[in-house]
Amino acid sequence: MHRRTPERFPPSAAWLTAALLLWAALQPLATRAQDASAAEERPNILFALADDVSFPHMGPRSPEWIETPHVTRVAREGLLFNRAYAPNNKCAPSRAAILTGRNSWQLGAAANHWAYWPDRFASYVEALGAHGYHTGHTGKGWAPGIAKKENGDPRYLAGVPFEERTTDPPTDAMSEIDYAANFRAFLDDASDEQPFAFWYGAYEPHRGYEYGSGIRKGGKRRDAIEQVLPFWPDTDSVRTDLLDYAFEIEYFDRQLGRMIDLLRQRGELDNTLVVVTADNGMPFPRVKGQTYERAAHLPLAMRWGNGIEHPGRVIEDHVSLIDLAPTFLEVAGVNRENTRMKPVTGRSLTGIFNAETEGQVNPDRNRVLVGKEHHDVGRPDDAGYPARGIITDDYFYVRNFKPDRWPAGPPQTGYLNVDGSPTKTAVLDARTDPDGARRFWEWSFGKRPPEELFRQVLVEHVARRGVAAQLL
C-alpha cells in the first residue's frame, strides 16, 4: 500500500487547516447518512392503548356483540397473545408499569392511583426520545397523577401531547379529541430521518357512558349477549351497560383503523411495530381495580411487517405489560443501561417475533405476577388494599394482605374503587334480595379471605362454570 510520508508531503499550517475544514464540511453529510441508515433500520412504534378492556373484548376472539375489525387485522397480520396480563389493574399504576417495565411494587409512589411520579423513574418514551426517536402522544398518557420536572414544567412521560384536533364523537360521553387527526399532525411534525414512537391513549371505554347508546346509536341488541357473566345480575340494565361499553370499544377500533390507513398511505406500515392492548380490565364490579382474572387478563395484538416472522400465529405464552418496554427498547436498538431508566423486570418479546412456532413458544413463560398497593381514596387514613397474585396455566393464587379492609372501598363512602354504573347499581340492589341474589354483592364488594385460589378454565367456559366453581 502506498503510504504518505513526511518526506513527500511535509506538513504545514495551511495544509492542516485545509484538511480540518474539509473534514468539518463532510461531517454533516456523514451524520445525515448515518441517521438515515438508522431510521431505516429502526422501526417506528405505534402503541394503541384502550382504557379499561378485558380479554377477549378486542380482536379475533371478541364476542359477536363487539366488532373490532382493525384490532382483528393487526392480530391476523401479526401475533395474537391469548395470555397477556396487566401487572396492576388500575389506570395509573398499570401505565406506570408499561412505561418503566417494572412491577408496581418496584415503583414507589408511581404504583398508586392519583400519585406524584417519582423523579428517579424514566419512561421508555423518554429513553427513545433521547436516542433519536420523534415521540408524542394523543389522549390519555400516564394518568391520573402529577408528573413534573424540577422547575415545575410538566413531564411528558408518554411524549409531547398532540390534542388540538377535535371532532364530534358519537356520544357526549366520549372524548372530543380526534385521535387519528392528531396522529396525522404528529407524523407531519416528524422529520424524514427520524423513526417515531407514538402513544395512542384513548379515553374509551372508560366511564361514564351515554346510557343506551349502544342500542340507539350502535344498533346493538340485548339478546346478542349470549350470557351475562355470573357475578352480575342478568337484567336489561346490565345488558344495556355492556352494549354501551362495546360501542365505545368500537370507537377506539375505528380510530385505530384510521391510523393504520395513514401509515399505509405513507408507506410506513410495514416498518411500524403496532401494539394494541388495554391498561386494565373492564370498568365493572369485580373487575377493574380488583385482583381477579377478568381484571388482569387483557387483549394483546401486534403487527410488524418487517419484523415478525410467520405472521398469523396465536401465542399462548404468559406475558405481562411490563414486557413491552424492553421490547420497544430492543427493536429500537437502545441499550437500557445507556438511558435514565431503572433496571427493568419485564422480558423482551422479540424471541417470539422471530420464532417459527405458535402456541407455547418459550416454556419459561409459564406464569405472570400481578398485584396492587393503593388505588382510590375512601378508607380510613387513606389506607390501601395491598395484594399479590401469581397466574399459571392451571391456577390463579391471590394473597390479600389486609383482609379486614373492604376490597372495593368501604360502604360508608360508596365502594369508591368501583366506578359508578348501572351494573354497580344492580349489584348493590341485589344485596337485600331475599332469593339469594346477595351473592352478587358478596362477589363484588364483600370482604375476602387472606388467600384465594382459583382454577383457571378456558375463557369460553368461564361464564358457564361460574365463579363458585372456580374457587378451590
PLM regions and their residue ranges:
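N-terminal secretory signal peptides that target proteins for export/translocation
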Residues: M1-P11
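Formylglycine-dependent sulfatase
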Residues: L16-L21, L29-H461, A469-Q470
